[in-house]
From Swiss-Prot:
SMART domains: RINGv (SM00744). Signal peptide: none annotated. Keywords: Coiled coil, Metal-binding, Phosphoprotein, Transferase, Ubl conjugation pathway, Zinc, Zinc-finger. E3 ubiquitin-protein ligase. E3 ubiquitin ligases accept ubiquitin from an E2 ubiquitin-conjugating enzyme in the form of a thioester and then directly transfer the ubiquitin to targeted substrates. It is an enzyme of class 2 (transferase). A zinc finger (RING-CH-type) spans 633-703. It comes from Rattus norvegicus. The RING-CH-type zinc finger domain is required for E3 ligase activity. This is Probable E3 ubiquitin-protein ligase MARCHF10.
Length: 790
């Protein structure tokens, strides 16, 4: 008991000790966590201050001396700052405030930059907090978007920019004091400002938007004749010359950026396909909240600038397109200015579209038709990605003009045919170099340039050329962002056919498209392109007559006898840069898998018919085989014994028919029957049961020469009785022996009692002391003897 109590007490004390230790460890862990939080807070504050300082420096450098704002704009900025509040903000980054005006003010181009000197780093605004959170939430993975190693290593990009500064200086010198060049330099500076924070991997949204807005304000001042915009253009020109080799968007000079700005549509879009690249597609996902306008705009602008750098031709190909005449550029600018006012009138709110885009800037920076051709073929995905359905009506530039449909038609023709190429041999060399530049892709989109006519068509209707880039955004705005780029990069005459594959069925792009892969040689590609160019020129006017109405154009593309469909299937090429975009390459490769659907279906149908006939013939053969096997078994086996299952019999052991059973139970061997009857008799069955068949319940006709069933039964019964008698005698003998043993023991006990009584009678009674001693002795004897008896 003592040991058990001690063990129990020890166990209780151990449990208490363990509980105390656990409580102590938990308290120490909580204290450690609190200390870490206290240490982490000052570090985060320091880091946020550094980020805010760096971002404010960048915004101050990008804005320059001309980034001033009126008192009305400051009031609107303060109202927007109070309106937008991010409840989930945990940290307060010291970032410059972002002008967040209404959608109508964005259309009118009044969104400008607040002076960074007025932004105090100690008091961050709620707009900056919300913008930082949104930028972290919706930022794409820029490392996955980049193609050239210049995007990954800023040191290498800086060296290349210094090496190629002279080339960019010569290029800008060729154009002279053209205002379009200065606009281009502003946009190149914007690109540099967008890509500098890419090395820091975060906090890109506020500074990039500031740079974008800073670039828009001087442009509008320059259009209005404001002389203050001129001094700011000069430093930006120098910056663009330094940054030109790295950006990759200087390829087309002043026409490289206009599709970016109209493409920043903040309306709803379809949810794209999702692959392993979740960060990229999460940036393209739909967001209908009004306070996210600025973040969505600058995020898409950055993605478009990066994607523009992926598909840029080399610098010596640049110079060929830079050599267009200054007179053409001035003519295009004048027409663009005329169309700008009409576009502003068309950009008023319309119930057909949930949100409107700004069509102010793109019409002011259009260039030669050759440059516009490269621009549209290079950026179709960005335009398709950022233009939702329902915005087609606002892309028509002249609302009151009776030739508004013709504008779209002629602009489509300019997209396909206004390619300023001087000689095809030089273009072949450029194409081969560009293919080598884009990871050695053999069938790049440059083959489309080789077969186009060399005569530009800018003199036909120069006022319509300014809207060449808007054609794609007006026609393919229903295409989801996850579709292959190769499904969009088709020239004008095949555009309706491309809509047939993409617009009406956005959720099944692989099944509904059937383009053939370009497996011919390079010379065959160029010949096929020339044939297709001639055919498309002859069929442009009837095919493009209904393009402002997308449903009619899609119905036209659905006709199976359309010649453009045959040309599309015969000559369709993948751009080489698709190898660097895995999510897009998936769809592009799937096109190759579905290129031979017709022939494959014919062959598969023939094979299936043959297999079906074989399957029909197989049951007949199986049935015949089974019947033949059964016949052979019956012939070979013959009559079987139902006990031993052996066919046939012998004269010494013949087959008998003892009962009325039929079939496989009809016959039985003689020896087998004897053994079976003996077993039944020895098992204790009576004679009637032994003589009855177990199956048919009829009497057995047993007439065996050497076996008498009745005699065997009687003998067995006699032997059984004898064995029972012998067993009973043995039992009696055993009982007698037991009784004898017990009787002897009882006799011994009786003898001892008698002898003791006799001794007590013969001897007199002793004295009391002697009697006591004798009684003790008798008691000892009585104790001993009963032990013996027992």
């Amino acid at each position: 008991m003592l040991h058990e109590a001690r063990d129990r007490q020890k166990f209780v004390s151990d449990v208490q000790y363990l509980r105390d230790m656990q409580h102590k460890v938990d308290s120490e862990y909580q204290a450690c966590l609190k200390r870490q939080e206290h240490k982490k807070e000052p570090n985060e504050k320091k880091q946020e201050q550094l980020w805010g300082k760096d971002t404010s420096d960048r915004s101050r450098f990008s804005s320059g001396s001309s980034c001033k704002q009126s008192s009305g704009e400051e009031d609107s900025l303060s109202e927007a700052r109070l309106a937008t509040k991010a409840p989930t903000a945990k940290c307060e980054p010291k970032l410059p405030a972002i002008d967040q005006t209404s959608v109508k003010q964005k259309h009118k181009g009044t969104m400008t930059l607040k002076k960074p000197e007025k932004v105090s780093p100690s008091k961050p605004s709620a707009v900056a907090q919300a913008t930082k959170i949104l930028s972290r939430k919706r930022r794409p993975n820029l490392g996955r978007l980049t193609v050239s190693p210049e995007m990954h290593s800023p040191r290498l990009s800086g060296e290349r920019s210094r090496q190629k500064a002279q080339l960019s200086t010569k290029t800008s010198g060729l154009l002279g004091a053209d205002p379009v060049v200065q606009q281009d330099s502003l946009l190149s500076a914007n690109e540099m400002k967008l890509k500098r924070p890419a090395r820091e991997k975060r906090n890109l949204a506020p500074s990039s938007q500031l740079v974008r807005v800073a670039g828009k304000a001087p442009l509008e001042r320059q259009k209005k004749g404001d002389p203050s915009a001129r001094p700011q253009n000069e430093p930006h020109t120098a910056l663009s010359q330094t940054f030109q080799p790295m950006s990759g968007s200087q390829v087309l000079t002043e026409s490289s950026v206009p599709p970016f700005l109209p493409a920043t549509v903040v309306g709803p879009r379809r949810a794209p396909f999702r692959f392993h690249d979740e960060d990229f597609y999460s940036a393209l996902s739909l967001n209908n909240e009004q306070e996210n306008y600025d973040t969505e705009e600058e995020t898409r602008t950055e993605e478009e600038l990066l994607l523009a750098g992926m598909r840029s031709p080399p610098s010596y190909k640049r110079s060929r397109f830079l050599g267009t005449s200054a007179a053409q550029n001035r003519n295009v600018e004048e027409n663009a200015e005329n169309l700008r006012g009409n576009s502003l009138r068309r950009s008023e709110p319309n119930p057909g579209s949930p949100r409107k885009t700004s069509v102010t800037e793109p019409t002011t920076k259009q260039s030669s038709p050759g440059q516009r051709m490269l621009q549209d073929t290079r950026l179709p995905r960005e335009l398709a990605k950022d233009n939702p359905s329902g915005d087609q009506d606002e892309k028509t530039p002249v609302p009151g003009d009776a030739k508004s449909d013709g504008v779209t038609q002629v602009s489509a023709e300019d997209v396909s045919n206004n390619c300023a190429v001087e000689d095809r041999s030089a273009v072949h060399n450029c194409e081969r170099d560009w293919q080598r530049y884009l990871s050695g892709s053999r069938n790049s989109f440059d083959c489309l340039l080789s077969g186009r006519p060399t005569a530009p068509r800018a003199s036909v209707n120069p006022s319509y050329n300014a809207h060449g880039s808007l054609f794609h955004s007006a026609v393919i705005d229903d295409i989801p962002a996850s579709l292959s780029v190769s499904s969009i990069l088709v020239p004008s005459a095949e555009l309706e056919e491309n809509l047939r594959f993409n617009v009406r069925r956005p959720l099944s792009p692989i099944r509904n498209r059937n383009p053939s892969a370009a497996s011919e040689s390079h010379s065959e590609d160029t010949q096929g392109e020339e044939e297709r160019a001639s055919t498309s020129q002859a069929q442009e006017s009837p095919l493009l007559s209904d393009l402002p109405n997308p449903q009619s154009s899609m119905a036209l593309g659905d006709s199976p006898s359309s010649p453009t469909r045959r040309h599309l299937q015969g000559h369709f090429y993948m751009p080489g840069s698709l190898q660097e975009n895995i999510p897009f390459t998936f769809f592009a490769v799937s096109d190759f898998a579905s290129q031979n659907d017709n022939g494959t279906s014919v062959r598969v149908s023939g094979v299936m018919d043959e297999k079906a006939t074989e399957i029909k013939a197989d049951p007949e053969k199986l049935r015949k085989l089974q019947e033949s096997l059964l016949e052979e078994d019956s012939e070979e086996e013959g009559d079987l014994c139902r006990i031993c299952q052996i066919a046939g019999g012998s004269p010494a052991n013949p087959l008998l028919e003892p009962c009325g059973c039929v079939g496989s139970l009809q016959f039985v061997h003689q020896e087998c029957l004897k053994k079976w009857l003996k077993v039944k008799i020895t098992s204790g069955a009576d004679l009637s049961t032994v003589k009855t068949c177990e199956m048919c319940k009829q009497g057995l006709l047993v007439d065996l020469d050497d076996f008498n069933m009745t005699e065997f039964y009687h003998k067995h019964q006699q032997s059984r009785a004898q064995s029972e008698l012998m067993n009973s005698g043995l039992y009696l003998v055993l009982l007698l022996h037991l009784y004898e043993q017990r009787f002897a023991e009882l006799m011994t006990l009786n003898y001892r009692r008698a002898s003791r009584e006799r001794m007590s009678r013969n001897y007199p009674q002793p004295r009391p002391e002697e009697s006591e001693s004798s009684e003790s002795g008798d008691g000892n004897e009585s104790n001993v003897y009963p032990g013996r008896v027992i």
